[in-house]
Amino acid sequence: MTARAFWLLCLIVGSSPEAPVAERKTSPPHSRKPDSRGCPSAEETPGPRAQPLLEAPQRPRAAEVAPAARAWPDPRRRKPPPPADNQASFREAARAPAGPPGPRLAQAENRASPRREPASEDAPRRARSRALRFPAARPPALATEGSAGHAHPNRPRAAALAPGPAPAPPPRFSLSFGLSPPQRDAEPGAEPCARACRSDLDEREAFCESEFAVNGIVHDVDVLGAGIRLVTLLVDRDGLYKMNRLYLTPDGFFFRVHMLALDSSSCNKPCPEFKPGSRYIVMGHIYHKRRQLPTALLQVLRGRLRPGDGLLRSSSSYVKRFNRKREGQIQGAIHTQCI
């Protein structure tokens, strides 16, 4: 009884589920070894044998799946495609031989790509665009060759230039960083006007022939009519070169001097010219009652011109911008005797 229980225990231990089933099934009979515990195997055990336990159905492993089942892989476990090579040489080598262009290739022809044409046939893109933009800046031979060559795929073909005289060069920039003013035709009466307004007398002659000589800043200019202006100068003590009976009105540090400027010329530019805020050297005559003025002029003035005010005529007066050179010549004329 004891031996039979011992053999039954060995049989139960040998057929327990902890042992690998595949190993028990696949191992051949000649490779089986006796149990290390000294228990003989089930085949060698005499007497009744125990029935093998029923095993639960197991899922087939991924390695044991038939090759036919791999035709429909799981899309979620699909392997990502291999990364594309960025080298142009490998892509070009893997391309298929050239055939008739498809619709997508014909549509892609409208894109500008530097690989469409070899670099040896045409100049670089910048030189080609500059040549198309300014055809007059290059020689005629190059202009004709560039216009007849293959046009850029993204630009319309330039029209052929009509044979004729070369177009005018682009305007040049002067040193003042601006465009040079256009040369306009001189007006027919511009030269006589400039000649009539320019005084032929120098500072010394004008000083001797005038009745007053001052330099001052133009305060205001009142235009009463065509060729009739009332000018107010602010003169300091150093600017009174020659006074005689010139009427002065004190105004703080300066003296106010009123003058009537008459322009007998029919020019667009007033003569003499006075700009408010500018400093001028003025030499002319003094108005008094003995000097008769036209009745129409007196009606326009309406008492604004008083005796002692200056009287400037375009032909017998001296009006020029102030500078140190002219002032020095007038200072020298003060100490000389007029003939």
UniProtKB/Swiss-Prot annotation:
Give residue spans, biased composition: Basic and acidic residues: 21-36, 112-125
Q: Which UniProt keywords apply?
A: Disulfide bond, Signal
Q: Which domain of life is it from?
A: Eukaryota
Annotated Gene Ontology cellular components are: collagen-containing extracellular matrix
Domain NTR spans what residues? Answer: 193-338
Please give the positions of the paired cysteines in each disulfide bond: C193-C267, C197-C271, C208-C338
Record-linked InterPro entries: Netrin_domain (IPR001134), TIMP-like_OB-fold (IPR008993)
Instruction: Indicate the segments annotated as coiled coil, or none if absent.
Output: none
Matches recorded under PROSITE patterns: NTR
Disordered as annotated region, ranges: 17-191
- Annotated signal sequence range: 1-17
Q: Where do Low complexity bias regions lie?
A: 56-72, 132-163
Family note: Belongs to the UPF0450 family.
According to UniProt, the name of this protein is: UPF0450 protein C17orf58
Give the gene that encodes this protein.
C17orf58
